[in-house]
């Protein structure tokens, strides 16, 4: 008799800018969990030669390309943050393509559960394709301070990004688990280790 194919359950991991999603994701990887980041998938679908990049250039012009033909993400970001209609168009183009890349990749995972990391997990509706949602949460002033320390950006740009993202309360409403990341890295790792051991006991993301 053939053995049934192994299929991991999928944990959606999300949080606002500067909440600590990347640090949390790194710890899960250290623990052996198969993970894909929406930002990685977003880069895959706009590589030179892919249809999505051609559509973006047709919409916004050649100014969104670097000299080597790669997408100039900073130039595109400036165009869409000031224009909600353009941002919506871009999201409608990319989200289905990114979802296809992500869930094809996650289906091949060999860990008991796999993680999909996305800042837009709720807004895009992709959380419907996960079995459980983990929200990384942090006070807004800490989100701003972390982002300013990490990125070459202004406080005004960070505020604009925060305002464009889903309201914190709405994100938390969709959470099965909440990790408050308001301490140091060791405290974050301790919380993740506990969650990981809990997740290993779940079947299909449920107790």
Curated annotation (Swiss-Prot):
Which pathway? Cofactor biosynthesis; coenzyme A biosynthesis; CoA from (R)-pantothenate: step 5/5
- Report which reactions are catalysed by this protein: 3'-dephospho-CoA + ATP = ADP + CoA + H(+)
Where does the protein principally reside?
Answer: cytoplasm
Residues that bind ATP: 18-23
| The entry's keywords | ATP-binding, Coenzyme A biosynthesis, Cytoplasm, Kinase, Nucleotide-binding, Transferase
Q: What is its EC number?
A: 2.7.1.24
Name the InterPro entries for this protein: Depp_CoAkinase (IPR001977), P-loop_NTPase (IPR027417)
Looking at the record, the residues that make up the DPCK domain are 10-207
Record's GO cellular component terms: cytoplasm
Q: Where in the cell is it found?
A: Cytoplasm
Quote the PROSITE patterns the UniProt record gives.
Answer: DPCK
Q: Work out whether the entry's keyword set contains Hydrolase.
A: no
Which GO terms of the molecular function aspect are on file? ATP binding; dephospho-CoA kinase activity
Q: Which GO terms describe its biological process?
A: coenzyme A biosynthetic process
- Gene3D superfamilies in the cross-refs: P-loop containing nucleotide triphosphate hydrolases
The EC class name is: transferase
NCBIfam families linked: dephospho-CoA kinase
Stated family: Belongs to the CoaE family.
Give the protein's function: Catalyzes the phosphorylation of the 3'-hydroxyl group of dephosphocoenzyme A to form coenzyme A.
> Protein name, please?
Dephospho-CoA kinase
From which lineage does this chain's organism come?
Bacteria, Pseudomonadati, Pseudomonadota, Gammaproteobacteria, Pseudomonadales
Q: Which gene encodes it?
A: coaE
């Amino acid at each position: 008799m053939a053995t049934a194919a192994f299929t991991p359950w999928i944990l959606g991991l999300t949080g606002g800018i500067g909440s600590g999603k990347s640090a949390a994701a790194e710890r899960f990887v250290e623990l052996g969990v198969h993970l894909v980041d929406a930002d990685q998938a977003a880069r895959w679908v706009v590589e030179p030669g892919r249809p999505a990049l051609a559509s973006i250039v047709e919409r916004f012009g050649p100014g969104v390309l670097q000299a080597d033909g790669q997408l100039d993400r900073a130039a595109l970001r400036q165009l869409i943050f000031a224009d909600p209609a353009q941002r919506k168009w871009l999201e409608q183009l990319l989200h289905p393509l990114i979802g296809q890349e992500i869930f094809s990749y996650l289906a091949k995972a060999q860990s008991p559960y796999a993680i999909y990391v996305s800042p837009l997990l709720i807004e895009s509706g992709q959380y419907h394709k996960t079995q459980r949602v983990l929200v990384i949460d942090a006070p807004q002033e800490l989100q701003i301070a972390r982002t300013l320390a990490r990125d070459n950006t202004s406080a005004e740009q960070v505020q604009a990004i925060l305002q464009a993202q889903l309201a914190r309360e709405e994100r938390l409403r969709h959470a099965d688990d909440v990790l408050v990341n308001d301490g140091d890295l060791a405290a974050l790792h301790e919380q993740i280790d506990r969650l990981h051991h809990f997740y290993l006991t779940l079947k299909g993301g449920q107790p």
